[in-house]
């Protein structure tokens, strides 16, 4: 009898637990449906007749929703009040959508939340302080949004917080005194000011660029009476009021100072006018030289560096007419100055996403490449800070940055010159009888070299991305060694200047060319691999060749036919013995171009996989290390 009673109680409690779990999962289901119905943009294709744990992006444990990952799926509009009902949620990711408005207040109910990824949206308003009261939060990424106001003072309440990314917003004020031990931190490209707190002085310099900040790891703060390197607004002294006599004295002093300045300017103008009269009289008797710079300026042609020492927008070769000279990072390529660079004979190499490129040849034999940046949207201080970071980057498969020049009208970047030009020109250029096709070994070497360069960039910092990976930015040396160019320039350029021809490489979640990510780089690199193997251009128009949606085209062919059918005929005509390795590299490219960012491999993983392909016995030879 006793055993029957125990059995009955066990069954009773089992059904109680089952009903409880079912009701909790039903509450989660209602919250997810409210989210689906409340957001705009691309609809979430969830099968409402199936259990919510089977829906795309939803992950469950013990019958409850513990993770919701919907990165780059085209959601837009404000988030509804719904997610706070997912009380067992540990991971929430809405990365790289077009969501806007403030964060819903019911986020405060997510007491088990550990990872929050909201970067790459258009969320606005102040960063809610309740995010830092979540007891289990470990990682917060709010980068690349439109958040305003100050960083909440209660950051230290999040005692388990290890990562805080707030870059590329519109935050103002000082950084609060953060005492918790953060492993990753970034507030670059905001409007913050003041001194950097000592506990953050060990963070990389790039974490603070694009603000009015001072102190380690940036330049030291100016010494003043406030003790923190900044002028404290509203600071109280013994008296904030000035006497009437002091005010009168200040007014008289200002008047006298203005009068003196006026007299100085007046005298200088008269002197300059006399000099111009004398100069004009002497010039009247001399022949008038023809200025190719002036002709170029009137023709409204594409920007160029012209050989007589002026750029096409009229920048003079006269050293007195330029504000500053070149800033060098390496001088092993040879000595030259701005005047010499502008006098060098120039040849147009091409017009890219960020500006036009030229081959500059000096009389003494030195040859360099010059990129003339257009639509730079960052101020001079931030431009110089970012270029200093780029100048410190060195890798065998990255084009070396030699020097740069900044003025109001000109932004020039000088790189090493690569004699064989770009991969794009070799793949899609003249295919006449005199052209030597790229064989499998050369293409595999190019893929590996480019992968190593991008992997190196990603290893420097979790927020460092190339941002503009395409075949025209893969340059080749005389020995066909691949070197990647145009790295890390995207955040400085206006997104309106990025043409449609890069769309074929752009990841589906990227809506703003300046808001890039490492996973988006992986997608672009995957397209590059497919381009190498198929010989087809992914851009809308490339050297008069019609472009295709490469990932979709490759997917459609491989689903219906043999994978070998996608390969460039020039690649398979003479090297059928390498077919197995080509298919392996093709699969790497396909995995990189998966629609969902979280499903893509990292660049170190991609590099390792390509290295394994190179070591395969079927390969024509080991790829260079």
From Swiss-Prot:
One example of a Gene Ontology biological process annotation: response to symbiotic fungus
Phosphoserine found at: 345, 422, 517, 619, 624
Segments forming domain Protein kinase: 343-613
Subcellular location: Cell membrane
TM helices/strands, residue ranges: 246-266
Keywords assigned by UniProt, alphabetized: ATP-binding, Cell membrane, Leucine-rich repeat, Membrane, Nucleotide-binding, Phosphoprotein, Receptor, Repeat, Signal, Transmembrane, Transmembrane helix
Domain of life: Eukaryota
InterPro entries to which the protein is assigned, alphabetical: At_inactive_RLKs (IPR050994), Kinase-like_dom_sf (IPR011009), Leu-rich_rpt (IPR001611), LRR_dom_sf (IPR032675), LRR_N_plant-typ (IPR013210), Prot_kinase_dom (IPR000719), Ser-Thr/Tyr_kinase_cat_dom (IPR001245)
GO cellular component: plant-type cell wall; plasma membrane; plasmodesma; plastid
GO molecular function: ATP binding; protein kinase activity
UniProt KW Phosphoprotein keyword: yes
Family: Belongs to the protein kinase superfamily. Ser/Thr protein kinase family.
PANTHER family membership: GENOME ASSEMBLY, CHROMOSOME: A02, OS05G0588300 PROTEIN
Protein name, UniProt field: Probable inactive receptor kinase At5g16590
Species the sequence originates in: Arabidopsis thaliana (Mouse-ear cress)
Organism placement in taxonomy: Eukaryota, Viridiplantae, Streptophyta, Embryophyta, Tracheophyta
């Amino acid at each position: 009898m006793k055993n029957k009673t125990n059995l009955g109680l066990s069954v009773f409690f089992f059904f109680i637990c089952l009903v409880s779990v079912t009701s909790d999962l039903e509450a989660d289901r209602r919250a997810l449906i409210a989210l689906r119905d409340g957001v705009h943009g691309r609809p979430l294709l969830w099968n409402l007749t199936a259990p919510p744990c089977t829906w795309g992006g939803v992950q469950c444990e013990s019958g409850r929703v513990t993770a919701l990952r919907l990165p780059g799926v085209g959601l837009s509009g404000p988030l509804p009040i719904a997610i706070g009902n997912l009380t067992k949620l540990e991971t929430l990711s809405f990365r790289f959508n077009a969501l806007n408005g403030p964060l819903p207040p019911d986020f405060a109910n997510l007491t088990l939340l550990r990872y929050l990824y909201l970067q790459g949206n258009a969320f606005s308003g102040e960063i809610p302080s309740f995010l830092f009261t979540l007891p289990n939060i470990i990682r917060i990424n709010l980068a690349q949004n439109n958040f305003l106001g100050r960083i909440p003072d209660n950051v230290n309440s999040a005692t388990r917080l290890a990562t805080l990314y707030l870059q590329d917003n519109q935050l103002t004020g000082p950084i609060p005194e953060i005492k918790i031990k953060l492993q990753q931190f970034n507030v670059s490209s905001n409007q913050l000011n003041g001194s950097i707190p000592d506990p953050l002085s060990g963070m990389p310099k790039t974490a603070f660029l694009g603000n009015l900040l001072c102190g380690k790891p940036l330049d030291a703060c100016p010494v003043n009476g406030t003790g923190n390197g900044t002028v404290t607004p509203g600071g109280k002294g013994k008296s904030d009021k000035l006497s009437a006599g002091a005010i009168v004295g200040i007014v008289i002093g200002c008047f006298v100072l203005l009068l003196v300045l006026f007299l100085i300017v007046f005298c200088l103008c008269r002197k300059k006018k006399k000099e111009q009269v004398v100069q004009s009289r002497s010039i009247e008797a001399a022949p008038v030289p023809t200025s190719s710079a002036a002709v170029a300026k009137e023709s409204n042609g594409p920007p160029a560096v012209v050989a007589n020492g002026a750029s096409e927008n009229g920048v003079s070769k006269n050293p007195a007419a330029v504000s500053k000279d070149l800033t060098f990072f390496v001088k092993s390529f040879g000595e030259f100055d701005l005047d010499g660079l502008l006098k060098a004979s120039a040849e147009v190499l091409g017009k890219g996403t960020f500006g036009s490129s030229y081959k500059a040849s000096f009389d003494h034999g030195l040859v360099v490449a010059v990129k003339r940046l257009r639509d730079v949207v960052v101020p001079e201080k931030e431009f110089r800070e970012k270029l200093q970071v780029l100048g410190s980057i060195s890798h065998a498969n990255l084009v070396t940055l030699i020097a740069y020049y900044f003025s109001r009208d000109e932004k020039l970047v000088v790189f090493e010159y690569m004699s064989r030009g770009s991969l794009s020109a070799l793949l899609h250029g003249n295919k006449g009888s005199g052209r030597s096709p790229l064989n499998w070994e050369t293409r595999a070497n190019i893929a590996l070299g480019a992968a190593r360069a991008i992997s190196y960039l990603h290893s420097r910092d979790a927020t460092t991305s190339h941002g503009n990976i395409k075949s025209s930015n893969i340059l080749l040396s005389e020995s066909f060694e691949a070197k990647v160019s145009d790295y890390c320039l995207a955040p400085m350029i206006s997104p309106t200047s990025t043409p449609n021809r890069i769309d074929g490489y752009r990841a589906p979640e990227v809506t703003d060319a300046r808001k890039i990510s490492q996973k988006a780089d992986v997608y672009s690199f995957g397209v590059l691999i497919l381009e190498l193997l198929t010989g087809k251009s992914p851009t809308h128009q490339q050297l008069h060749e019609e472009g295709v949606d490469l990932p979709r085209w490759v997917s459609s062919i491989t689903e219906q036919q043999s994978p070998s059918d996608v390969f460039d005929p020039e690649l398979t005509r003479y090297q059928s013995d390498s077919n197995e390795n080509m298919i392996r590299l093709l699969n790497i490219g396909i995995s990189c171009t998966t629609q969902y960012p979280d499903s893509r491999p990292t660049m170190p993983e991609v590099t390792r996989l390509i290295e394994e392909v190179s070591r395969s016995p079927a390969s024509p030879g080991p790829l260079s290390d």
